[in-house]
Amino acid sequence: GLVEDYGYYSSGESFSISDPEEVWIMELIGKGEGEKGAVWVALKVPDGYISGHANQARITTFPKNDPENCMFAEDVISFAREKGWYEGTDEDFSFSDVYVPVDFGGARFCEARVWAGFNKVASGMEKYTEYARGVVKHAGPNNFASNRMPLWVKPDKKLSVQDVMGMMRDHFEGTVLDMTQDI
């Protein structure tokens, strides 16, 4: 492919790719100095669900044997091992936690925007408020972030264009992150 032949220089990008039948979210990160190419993962968003991204890699673990719903660079895991960034099992490999670990800034200034959109249209998002405030907890054998939001949520109702516009325009009004409340 083009990235393998010509390279890719970026700390990372997230893409929403869609047609009338399906939507995919793809994350792509250049291999860095002295390397050519990129590592990437793409996941199909399940029917009836929504996803979002805002300047922070969000794909964590992913199925390795489901080409109908997941595609990834052949060396996405082996490259991390070669660099000494990951020693765990293939099953536990988390793209975001290995290549772009979420920190306070990633959670508070990027993921919080996704949380705000999800919070407007899906019940149960209050359990991720602490994470949206920038509190990232770590656990497990690889010490990955353990309180992250899901990559996608099922909205409480079918969304209208106006609903989506409201999500895009949200500034945390009416939440604990409301900037008019001096937080």
Predicted regions and their residues:
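C-terminus-biased signal that marks the final domain/tail of proteins
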Residues: 6-10, 20-23, 47-183
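Structured, non-membrane catalytic/scaffold regions adjacent to prosthetic-group chemistry
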Residues: 1-44, 183
